[in-house]
């Protein structure tokens, strides 16, 4: 169902002449893997979105940092990064000790939310618009708001993804155009 909705979005944007990259991410055995399902130059690459599958954990902050690096090769001046999220960053591998924090810590809860929000702020500081479609538990609403602020839309069912993301994209394009 996620792949179908992602396909609809990617196909619609490409049909409007908007360059589209579709990427998924997960963390497996200590590695955060970004998988490009459809890249900007892929002619009719939207079908590759059907290769999406959910797996592993999600270290959102690191994935966003990687997405920011990938955006540097994008063909447009202005960029919009839209995520489908449950606003519950979580990883099986701990955060390593640093000078400020001498003990390792779990990557979950408030620590994961803070890390993800920091990466969203960093992307926005680079001029990248970041928005999210949130599909998660009521308990995760405060985390979603803390991470994405006003650039957030909530859905309750996956079949609402394409329409909701479409409205979010329209809002973001209006902002980018002004």
Annotated model-derived regions:
Residues 1-178:
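Acidic, glycine-rich A-domain
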């Amino acid at each position: 169902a996620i792949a179908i909705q992602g396909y609809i979005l990617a196909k619609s944007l490409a049909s409007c002449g908007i360059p589209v990259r579709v990427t998924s991410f997960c963390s497996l055995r200590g590695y955060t893997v970004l998988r490009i399902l459809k890249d900007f130059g892929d002619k009719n690459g939207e079908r590759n979105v059907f290769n999406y599958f959910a797996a592993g954990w999600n270290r959102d902050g690191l994935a966003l940092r990687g997405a920011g690096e990938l955006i540097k090769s994008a063909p447009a001046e202005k960029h919009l990064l839209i995520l489908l999220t449950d606003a519950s960053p979580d990883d099986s591998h701990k955060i390593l000790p640093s000078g400020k924090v001498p003990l390792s810590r779990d990557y979950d809860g408030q620590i994961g939310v803070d890390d993800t929000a920091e990466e969203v702020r960093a992307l926005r500081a680079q001029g990248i618009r970041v928005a999210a479609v949130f599909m998660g538990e009521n308990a995760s609403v405060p985390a979603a708001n803390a991470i994405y602020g006003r650039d957030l839309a909530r859905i309750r069912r996956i079949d609402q993804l394409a329409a909701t993301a479409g409205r979010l994209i329209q809002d973001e394009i209006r902002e980018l155009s002004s």
